[in-house]
Regions:
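N-terminal amphipathic/basic-hydrophobic helices that include classical n-h-c signal peptides
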Residues: 1-22
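Short glycine/proline-enriched loop/turn "hinge" motifs that connect secondary-structure elements
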Residues: 26-27, 180
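Structural alpha/beta surface segment adjacent to cysteine/selenocysteine redox centers
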Residues: 45-135, 208-212, 220-223, 229-232
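Local sequence-structure signature of Cys/Sec-based thiol-disulfide redox active-site neighborhoods
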Residues: 27-51
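Short strand-loop junctions, especially beta-strand C-caps/beta-turns
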Residues: 36-38, 122, 193
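C-terminal cap of thioredoxin/glutaredoxin-like
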Residues: 50-51, 129-232
Length: 232
């Protein structure tokens, strides 16, 4: 017997009660994952692009947050074991994250991802890390006031950056860098990967990372990197 495809019968085939509520909740309530970044780091950039891919194939939503490589290396690690050239680069690393913090103060945390994308595309994909035009261009692209660029040379938002940074590193420890992600209350460094996994490959990596992160007593998986960051 074939049941006619009428509006009444379509309604009768819909999930009811608790089943319908659960299905609706699953569709409408993606899992929040905290992602700490410094726009200067090429490895964090690649991982952030992976995170955006994960959002397309898994019920996950990134909550973008700030950390500072300058604060980590110059203050918390006191520059130990770093070359003078690296220390000089770190001293300049304050600028971009200060602008990001000022933008969040101006427009709210929702601006973090688009501004990070605008800055990171220029820094990493276009290879313009030393170009002073990057910050003004990124602010213009995201519809933010050009005046926010002045925050690069101001300490007004340093405490905001440090507070966000410390939230991550109080959980994950000081012997790591960026990115830091927190999944279901468990913070880890990484994953460090290149090039960016896309589509279902991104989803499978997410599944594995989420699984090991929830394992009691899990601390580390690591091997030496044998290739440079790829921004394809």
């Amino acid at each position: 017997m074939v049941i006619p495809d009428t509006p009444t019968n379509r309604w009768n085939r819909r999930p009811r009660g608790r089943v319908a509520a659960v299905m609706t909740e699953q569709v409408q309530s993606p899992e929040d994952v905290q992602f700490w970044f410094d726009p200067l780091c090429p490895w964090a950039w690649i991982t952030s692009r992976w995170m955006l891919e994960v959002e397309k194939v898994r019920p996950v939503r990134a909550d973008w947050r700030m950390m500072s490589l300058a604060y980590l290396n110059l203050i918390q690690h006191e520059g130990n074991g770093q070359s003078p050239e690296y220390m000089e680069r770190m001293s300049r690393a304050w600028g971009p994250i200060r602008v990001v913090a000022a933008a969040a103060g101006h427009s709210g945390p929702g601006v973090l991802e688009p501004l990070y994308t605008a800055i990171g595309t220029r820094f990493h994909v276009q290879g313009r890390r030393e170009d002073p035009a990057v910050i003004p261009e990124a602010l213009a692209e995201t519809g933010l006031p050009a005046s926010l660029a002045a925050a690069a040379d101001s300490t007004d938002y340093d405490q905001v950056i440090k507070d966000s940074h410390n939230e991550a590193f109080d959980d994950v420890g000081l012997d790591v860098g960026t990115p830091v992600i927190r999944i279901r209350g468990h913070a880890i460094f990484g994953p460090v990967v290149t090039p960016t996994p896309r589509g279902e490959a991104a989803g499978r990596l997410w599944d594995g990372v989420a699984l090991v992160t929830e394992t009691d007593g899990f601390f580390e998986l690591k091997r030496s990197r044998d290739r440079k960051p790829s921004f394809d």
